[in-house]
Amino acid sequence: MYDNLKSLGITQPEDVDRYSLRQEANNDILKIYFRKDKGEFFAKSVKFKYPRQRKTVVSDNASHGYKEINEINPNLRYVIDELDQLCKRDQIEVDLKRKILDDLRHLESVVTNKIAEIEADLEKLTNGR
């Protein structure tokens, strides 16, 4: 799993925290950030430079027969797919954690209100005698 990341020398893909992608001239620059260890100020990162793929395609303008376009490198596309899987998984885990915490807070509120209601009923019973 994560063969493309491993081919880049990333031996522990599960340590990937996030990534950024930018275009610089005819290159795409991919920067991968890893989770910080305790006591570190900055996250470790690695940078990769991919040349953009040049393609000649039929022009939609009738007067010009062909035009040259630049596209993302196919290998980079595969790497980004794997990075998206990793980063999305982390987001799903965070969302699930947030949902569980919200459910706990709601349950706590419901139980607190129910206890107050029962105590009020008990108070009515003891004061009624």
Swiss-Prot record:
Q: Where in this chain does the entry annotate a coiled-coil region?
A: none
Instruction: State the InterPro entries in the record.
Output: UPF0325
Annotated disulfide bonds: none
Similarity field: Belongs to the UPF0325 family.
Sorted alphabetically, which HAMAP family does this protein's record hold? UPF0325 (MF_01519)
Under what name is this protein listed?
A: UPF0325 protein YPO1040/y3141/YP_2811
This chain's source organism reads: Yersinia pestis
